[in-house]
UniProtKB/Swiss-Prot annotation:
Family per similarity comment: Belongs to the phosphatidylserine decarboxylase family. PSD-B subfamily. Prokaryotic type II sub-subfamily.
Post-translational modification: Is synthesized initially as an inactive proenzyme. Formation of the active enzyme involves a self-maturation process in which the active site pyruvoyl group is generated from an internal serine residue via an autocatalytic post-translational modification. Two non-identical subunits are generated from the proenzyme in this reaction, and the pyruvate is formed at the N-terminus of the alpha chain, which is derived from the carboxyl end of the proenzyme.
Lipid bilayer topology: Peripheral membrane protein
UniProt-listed Enzyme Commission number(s): 4.1.1.65
Residues at the catalytic site: 113 (charge relay system), 169 (charge relay system), 256 (charge relay system), 256 (schiff-base intermediate with substrate)
Protein name, UniProt field: Phosphatidylserine decarboxylase proenzyme
Top enzyme class: lyase
Gene: psd
Protein's organism: Clostridium botulinum (strain Hall / ATCC 3502 / NCTC 13319 / Type A)
Amino acid sequence: MIKYYNRKNKDYDIEKVAGEKYLNWTYSSPIGMNLLEVFIKKKFFSKIYGFYCDRRLSHKKINKFINDFKIDMSLSENQSSNFKCFNDFFTRKLKKEARPIKTDKNLLISPGDGKILAYENLNLNSVTEVKGINYSFYELINNDSLAKEYDNGTCLVLRLCPTDYHRFHFIDNGICENTIKLKGFYYSVNPIALSKIPSVFCKNKREYSIFHSENFGDIIFMEVGATCVGSIIQTYKPNTKILKGDEKGYFKFGGSTVILFFKKNTIKIDNDILNQSKLGYETSVVMGESIGIKK
């Protein structure tokens, strides 16, 4: 059971997890864990499933998925009958009015839909995941000199579950450098998995780029892959002018994570998100929603 904070009704909700029985079996049974290490965490498994989700045969999954998880298709640019395959549906674009952008330059917005955690006064040797598992920022970024620039800064971890909108966006005007890709495995990023596999974010395939924002300084913008995420697709053009809310990219099928790192004294995260993070609870947010303010 995954409990998260709903800031709209100021109460806790229970997340309905796609493939929950499979996740629990894989990460809680000896057979499942052995299968995970031998096969499921490997690129080959995610590629196979990604291949299926790119084929017309997978279209039959769409309506069941929509009904099971009560996905509001009135927000989508296209309806279910217009999608060619499951990945076409999974990476669907939303109507512009579905995700209004807070235009005030001092407001920090969420880069996507999902559940968010926030950490201030970043300790480079110990960043805390869901369930209290720690990992090293040095190991995550694999660049010690760059990592040191973010000592005592702020970290935001946005977890996108399979039922979420899976495109991610820029949080400010600015210019973004080329993407750096780091090889890794494909463990699940669901809290069920995070509690069983130490330092998942450091072990999984991930990509990051430096975003030179106009109002929040230089930000490390990282995307982390997960089980069945066949691809992390970057749609932005490096080293060109970017506007707040512009699309940066998207994930193909699977749960995935966006992580942002800010330098010291650049932002102040909203108190409700910070307080819930300290209690160990994620907060649900949508792309374009205000989550903090410029210092």
